[in-house]
Design a protein with these regions (language model features):
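Rossmann-fold NAD(P)-binding glycine/threonine-rich loop
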Residues: 93-117
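Active-site-lining helix/loop region of Rossmann-like oxidoreductase modules
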Residues: 8, 16, 134-256
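Hydrophobic/small residue at the entry helix of a nucleotide-binding pocket
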Residues: 13
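Extreme N-terminal starter segment of soluble prokaryotic enzymes
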Residues: 1-5
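Rossmann-fold NAD(P) dinucleotide-binding segment
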Residues: 56-65, 73-92
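NAD(P)-binding Rossmann-fold cofactor-contacting core
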Residues: 23-44
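Peri-transmembrane interface segments
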Residues: 247, 253-272
Length: 272
């Protein structure tokens, strides 16, 4: 018997979930829910029902798990606790500083409804979290380092696009080479958030938007840009489509530690 899956939100993440379902014989895509006109959504799977997001509760007894593919900035903090009242839910909430708060909200809703809520199971937090866990088990005396990029952060790009005056935008997370090399060399440096990464934004403005105001909102945004050296470029919509239409990304989880009676052996575990 297959597990019946619903997908809430059909962007890049939603399509990725659809591809993953195809590779698992015990999963079945039952329905896709969207805030767009359902008739405008073309799924990769044939004969899958596409519904308005507002109709999702009508599927309460037809879906076993609802996977939420919205953004962490404004969608998931509202959606995950709300839909946990009706479904078992999974999300990839990735605003690290707000995970305890998000956990409490989802936990309360799921316990009250008798459902299961699984949060923050994306890339990081998610896969990278698992790699940190096993590396810590192997090298208990050591330090963790995580570097993201160079690549597009969909969460940060989504946060940019929600600013008034922004028509579209992409954000690249870029590791600081000197910091990365110091870690790989086993130097165990003490690094601030700002010393590990820079952020580069390519933004298309709405007509009449205040460029300086938008730039300030980006650079001072808590949990996203305020702790980083951030560069904002204003470009045309055509430039964005031509040069920044992809969503490549990468990253490195590194555990540097020592073993031996006198801690005489140095080791580095790296996952990318």
């Amino acid at each position: 018997m297959s597990i019946r899956i619903g997908i809430m939100g059909y962007g890049n993440l939603g399509r990725g979930i659809e591809c993953a379902i195809k590779q698992n014989e015990d999963l079945e895509l039952t329905a896709v829910f969207t805030r767009r006109n359902p008739e405008s959504v073309q799924t990769l799977s044939k004969d899958v029902t596409v519904c308005k997001a507002s109709e999702v509760t009508d599927w309460k007894d037809k879906i076993d798990v609802l996977i939420l593919c919205g953004g962490s900035a404004t969608d998931l903090p509202e959606q995950t606790p709300e839909y946990a009242k009706y479904f078992n839910v999974v999300d990839s909430f990735d605003t690290h500083a707000r995970i305890p708060e998000h956990f409490d909200n989802v936990d309360a809703a799921a316990k009250n409804a008798g459902t299961v809520g699984i949060i923050s199971v994306g890339w990081d937090p998610g896969m990278f979290s698992l790699n940190r866990m096993y590396a810590n088990a192997i090298l208990p005396n050591g330090k963790d380092y995580t570097f993201w990029g160079k690549g597009v952060s969909q969460g940060h790009s989504d946060a940019i696009r929600r600013i008034d005056g922004v028509k579209d935008g992409k954000q690249y997370t870029i590791p600081v080479d000197a910091a990365l090399e110091a870690v790989r060399n086993g130097e165990n440096p003490e690094l601030t958030t700002r010393q590990k990464h820079t952020r580069e934004c390519f933004v298309v403005l709405e007509d009449g938007a205040d460029a300086k105001k938008v730039e300030n909102e980006i650079k001072t945004m808590p949990n996203y840009f305020a702790d980083y050296d951030t560069t904002v470029h204003y470009i045309s919509e055509e430039e964005l489509k031509e040069n920044h239409s992809g969503i490549p990304h990468g990253g490195f989880v590194i555990r540097s530690g020592k073993t031996g009676w006198e801690e005489e052996n140095s080791h580095v575990i790296e996952y990318s």
